[in-house]
Amino acid sequence: MGKVITVWGSPGSGKSMFSCILAKALTRDKRKAIIINAEISVPMLPVWLPEQIIQTNASVGQVLSSVEIDTSLVAGHVTVLKSYPFIGVMGYAAGENPLSYPEVKYAMVLQLVNAAARLVDFVILYCSSNMTNVFTPAAIESGDLVIRILTPDLKGVNYLKAHQPLLGDGRFHYDQHMTFAGMARPFHALDEMGHIIGGWDGLLPYGKEIDRCATEGGMFQAIKYCNPKYTASLNKVLDALEQMELADDAAEDDVSETEHFEEETADE
């Protein structure tokens, strides 16, 4: 099973760009990643891939409105980057709107995530800021690593205060989320805002070149323009994932040793 990374947070905090940069970093060694977004108010397929012609039947809406979701259905609706075949994306297609599909069910999101994690090494769930979109709470519940990105201003702080009570259930692991200051600029009161929310794990500063990549439809090229603080935050995420993988490997070794011991005992 692949690792599931959930990216959520306040509007305008740079979640979509971070998801693309993270996907590029995770696939440097030719491992595979899928980014999934289910925010129909802004269909992401034409934003991610403005130069690729994408048919409507590639939409994630077709998957989420299915009776049952399995790996073959998911694989058939992943759009692979022509310029970088280790990354696939799933989202809504150009022209789709909230009336294009039936209401998404929480259980179907969980099925989608589970199926996607069986296909690739990493699944990045890029969430809407709107918690009434069931994809967001389901993605937070599903995440092996959850990344919370907030603008370091009053909007970001009050977004968090408003949504924290909705994530109080233990299945959301609220206290284990990594928190980053997104679109941080020199004039932001980072220390004060960090004190209010309980501290930052790192900064994802605003950069003109990164912004230009988003504007020009080259989001997957932006990793080349990350400044040292952005890169340090990205490395924290990569380190956290590496620690998880090491822990999983150790657990598998323990299970194998236990099974081997039990077999030897049975033979005696």
Short names for language-model regions:
Residues 2-41, 45, 116:
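Walker A/P-loop phosphate-binding motif and the immediately C-terminal alpha-helix
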Residues 182-224:
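Beta-strand-loop-alpha "switch" segments that mediate conformational coupling across diverse proteins
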Residues 122, 145, 199-202:
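Well-ordered beta-strand positions
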Residues 103-110, 161-187, 222-225:
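P-loop/Walker A phosphate-binding loop and immediately adjacent motor/lid segment at beta-alpha junctions
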Residues 7, 36, 91-92, 124-126, ...:
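Conserved beta-strand segments of the P-loop GTPase G domain that flank and frequently precede/overlap
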Residues 35-118:
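P-loop/Walker-type NTP enzyme "switch/lid" segment
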Residues 216-268:
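NTP-binding/hydrolysis catalytic cores, primarily Walker-type P-loop NTPases
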Residues 134-153:
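Inter-motif core of Ras-like GTPase G domains
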